[in-house]
Amino acid sequence: MRDIEVRCHGGISIISAFAQRFGASVSIGLEMGVRFSGAVQFPGGSIETEKTLGFLLKKYPGSTIPGITIESDIPQGQGLKSSSAFTLALVVGFTAINGMNISELETLRLAAEASIANGTSITGAFDDLCSSYYGGVCLTDNASMDLLKRYDSPTGLVLIAYNPEKYRITGSMDISTLRKYSESFTPLKDLVMNGYPLAASLINGHLIGEITGMNTDVIGYFREKGASYVSQSGKGPAVFAVFHRKRDLDDAVRYFPTGTGFRCISTGFTNEGIRVSDK
């Protein structure tokens, strides 16, 4: 049996689909690599890994269970799409190692089902899966699991601020409050369709942040340092800032307040999609 590696990216929320059926996200340079090797009785790993493989084995009885090794640059539980990248990589690797021939759309819908089954998503996060699979900006109908539009990422340098001691797990969120404000999210779809993903992302983050809470001190700091767009990434709690001048980003990192528990990661948007290679 061949060994393979699957590599894909995290992302930033543009429209969170908790409140209504449409979702959108944009891929960023933070990457996850998952290596699949040989056949094992039990691969070990996290409960999410167990649940994902259990879901896939129920779907495809008699399939080979591969050994799995995960390396990731994507902070977990921060709204940066680490769970979607993880689930997508597992589904793509599992189907590849078992020689299954399924279409891109079938793969993405299977990953959305797996995301619900493993408890990392409430809606299936079809938008996040699409941006990780294709790169760039993806707008989706998460109810019908259809890709409505995909286009290249906006320009700009991205700075992420997050506190590793504070995180939010999507599967444990109460989204009933968000759904009460579904009409507030309705205009965001048109913004994305018309090529304004960062404007939509800014509004989306602030709408959700009003309910979940957000770090206004960090947001205000990045604004002072010249960021063009600053918001919480979806449910957060990570904050992202987009700069158009490198010296502004460098200053934001250099003078970031100490003793806050926050870490900063410099990255960028990416149009690179998922890659599968033999190892």
Language-model-detected regions and their locations in the chain:
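ATP-binding N-lobe of GHMP and related small-molecule kinases
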Residues: 1-78, 268-272, 276-279
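Short beta-strand-to-loop capping motifs
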Residues: 38, 164, 241-245
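Short glycine/serine- and small hydrophobic-enriched flexible loop segments
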Residues: 54, 58, 89-97, 190, ...
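Phosphate-handling active-site elements
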Residues: 62-67, 94-110, 247, 251-256
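DPxDG-like acidic metal-binding loop motif
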Residues: 80-106, 133-135
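Alpha/beta catalytic cores of group-transfer enzymes, especially the acyltransferase/condensing modules
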Residues: 105-149, 219
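Acyltransferase
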Residues: 153-214, 220
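Glycine-rich, charge-dense phosphate/pyrophosphate-binding loop(s)
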Residues: 193-279
